[in-house]
């Protein structure tokens, strides 16, 4: 992304560009070119992998019930990063279209350079805030990530806000100055980007994102963490929030929140009431990322909330000040809108109550004693070829088969490495019946979402969902460096019914694997050197 000379000049004077342009808006039927290009997002130029040529990628939007037809074209060539690609539409259930879910070697083979693949899926019963990203190797850390919003013309919260459009979408990202495959974890980002703009350490001139508001109006802000690693504490000076959505699921309005802790891949919608004196206010994003030497290694992310009529200058408040929260968002205080209780477990179903024990043994993560290694044949293709049991499905020990139309509970103790990990389940949202920072179980009205932090030492998280969507669904840590080190399993839901449920599978899907397998080794997915995964500090 190039900035004009006048933008840089104004930034040097502490002048904000109130005409800040949002990324392009496309969809629901569109082409999406995946390219290599140089970007300068924080004062440091580097080559990146970009969707639509921008970071973040263009906002893909549609309405509840729409058919999305997104034709992804792979124009990648820079072999310091992956040149094959896949796209995951994070939070979309993909009912009957598991083949379009995106994770490499779970539901498809990667798209080879010079080739295209049409992702064709509908969202009949979903609306909310989602995102999309590469789901192979560490590619999304190199730039392939963007927002995805499904609007609901009959939104039950519609009377709470006046504005909800592309100008109210905020993405939070970590950014690195070298290719992800070369980074040695724990990965200290060089900067935090808000809507694709930020400043590296000691930089005071790179342009910042500006969110424009008008006094007296109410805005639905859609906050998306497209983070590859750290979680963030998000605040806006002088303003509180009313939370109305978590991960594409409506919540009872929760007012008075002054800080949102948001983990990689999570999303929140909140109402911002522009009721403060006309001025400019800092939007602050503090990364919870501690370097290997035990000191904070990444500068805070900054953007500007600009009221119409305020002078075009930086906010007067100290930009380096760390806000003190009085009423931070706590997950257990969120409740699903219209909740009617959580289904009971079937005591006769042994495979319906699963405990996943997470451990780390340099350089790999293990789930119940097994580290995830991608198979050479996608799990979906294995099922379509007649493998239906956990014993038959690869990778060995990492596939759990689940019966259909059952309530499943997954129990996840926290504390591995002493840090919180965001766990994401594909194909479903789930009820968080016990949150990481709570010792209470809520079976009446827990929040529903698709990505949950399992917390630190002593935490215990439990989730429940119903197996009403046959297919192999990835469950993994959304810290991408941890996924690359084996922090994942596959939940194979009702494998025997998958061939009849997941259809029609397009002929182009069948061609992905032969084309990928014919690629030379240097064009297949880059694997981080084992040494790059061996330096996580035990805390």
Curated annotation (Swiss-Prot):
Catalytic activities: 4 hydroquinone + O2 = 4 benzosemiquinone + 2 H2O
PROSITE patterns for this protein: MULTICOPPER_OXIDASE1
InterPro entries tied to this protein: Cu-oxidase-like_N, Cu-oxidase_2nd, Cu-oxidase_C, Cu-oxidase_fam, Cu_oxidase_CS, Cupredoxin
Main location class: secreted
Keyword Ribosomal protein applies: no
Subcellular location per the Swiss-Prot or TrEMBL entry: Secreted
Limits of the Plastocyanin-like domain: 37-154, 166-309, 374-495
PANTHER family (alphabetical): FI03373P-RELATED, MULTI-COPPER OXIDASE
Protein name: Laccase-1
Encoding gene per record: LCC1
